Amino acid sequence: MSNLLNKFADKLHGNDHDERYEDDNDDQTRQQRHEKHQQREFRNQGSKADPYGEENQGNFPQRQQPQSNLGGNTQFGGNDFQQQTTDYTAGTGGGTYTQTYRETNTQGQLDDDEDDDFLTSGQQQKQGRTRGAQSNRYQSSNIGSGRRDLSGSGNDEYDDDSGNQGVW
């Protein structure tokens, strides 16, 4: 009965076809109807927590806002050197994202115990770690004078290939 009243109210408001009531049986209990509506409601709005879930395709604009702290990457501005992981938020639909990366310590064991893999590039340059312009080679003046060959072939000045095999 309440269902008929609802339909009537919808018609009064110019809402002839309201999908909330479309396949309702009048002999369903109120609880069953409620659960059915709730399911349909969830299906329509999708799971807000998971914008890339199956049921959500097509419900969201193609270009997502960058998800700022999934995986720790802030995706505006330059590279985020603090969180140096290679994961970035997939599925941003053509949006530009900056891939952050870890500047790996390729010199073998450092003399000091500090973990300077996670320094910003500015801090690394203060420590004498400069990033080569074209090549992925780092020279570190705070490690000693031995020039390491970082290509993995292991030819450095002292013929010591202990710490630099195949890092790249």
From Swiss-Prot:
Chief location category: cytoplasm
Compositional bias of kind Basic and acidic residues: 8-20, 27-43
UniProt keyword Protein biosynthesis, yes or no: no
Cellular-component GO terms for this entry: cytoplasm
Induction note: By osmotic, ionic and heat stress, and by water-deficiency.
Cellular compartment(s): Cytoplasm
Region feature Disordered, mapped onto this chain: 1-168
Bias (Polar residues): 56-81, 120-144
Keywords associated with the record: Cytoplasm, Stress response
Note: 'De respuesta a estres' means stress response in Spanish.
Descriptive protein name: Protein GRE1
This protein's encoding gene: GRE1
